[in-house]
C-alpha cells in the first residue's frame, strides 16, 4: 500500500486515541475524536488511504477498538517501531494492516509518501528514497488481513453465517461489540 504518512511519537495509548467521551458517540462521530488530545484537528486533515506511522509501544493501555475507528477514517495502515501486542492483535482482527518497522519515525516526516508491502516486508519512503526490509508477518495474519479481519474470515470459512461477512467488516460492529459506540 502507498499513501501519505502522518508521524506520531512513542507510547501513544488507546485512551488518547479513543477518549472516554467518544465511547458515547456513534462510530462516525467517535472517529472524529481520534488523536484530538495529541493532535487536535488531525481527523479533519487525514484522508482515505493515508498511513499512520508511530514510534515505540504504539497502542498501549486498555483494549479499546481504535482500529475500527482508523478503518472508519479510511486509514490504510498502521506502521510503528513497536506495537503493544494487544493493540496489534486488535488491528489485525479489525482487518487493519499493521507493520513493525524499527526506526520508521526517523525515516519519515509528515506528508511524505510511503510504500509498505506486508507480503514482502519491504518499505520505502517515496519522498526521500529511504527504505528497507523487515520480517514478513505469518501467513495466518496475512490471511486474516486479506479477508478484512477475523470475523469476516470466520464467516467466509463457514464458522459464522455467510450473510454476515460484509456486515462484520463494518467499523460499527467492532465498536458496538466492544461495549462502546452506538
Swiss-Prot record:
GO terms for biological process, alphabetical: L-leucine biosynthetic process
Record gene name: leuD
Record family assignment: Belongs to the LeuD family. LeuD type 2 subfamily.
UniProt xrefs under InterPro entries: Aconitase/3IPM_dehydase_swvl, AconitaseA/IPMdHydase_ssu_swvl, LeuD, LeuD_type2/HacB/DmdB
Record keyword Aminoacyl-tRNA synthetase present: no
UniProt function note: Catalyzes the isomerization between 2-isopropylmalate and 3-isopropylmalate, via the formation of 2-isopropylmaleate.
Any single Pfam family the record assigns to this protein: Aconitase_C
Name of the protein: 3-isopropylmalate dehydratase small subunit
Enzyme class: lyase
Keyword NADP belongs to the record: no
Alphabetized UniProt keyword annotations: Amino-acid biosynthesis, Branched-chain amino acid biosynthesis, Leucine biosynthesis, Lyase
Reaction(s) this enzyme catalyzes, per UniProt: (2R,3S)-3-isopropylmalate = (2S)-2-isopropylmalate
Gene3D superfamilies linked to this entry: Aconitase, domain 4 (3.20.19.10)
EC number(s) per entry: 4.2.1.33
Binding partners and assembly: Heterodimer of LeuC and LeuD.
Source species of the chain: Mycolicibacterium smegmatis (strain ATCC 700084 / mc(2)155)
Any GO molecular function: 3-isopropylmalate dehydratase activity
Domain of life: Bacteria
Pathway: Amino-acid biosynthesis; L-leucine biosynthesis; L-leucine from 3-methyl-2-oxobutanoate: step 2/4
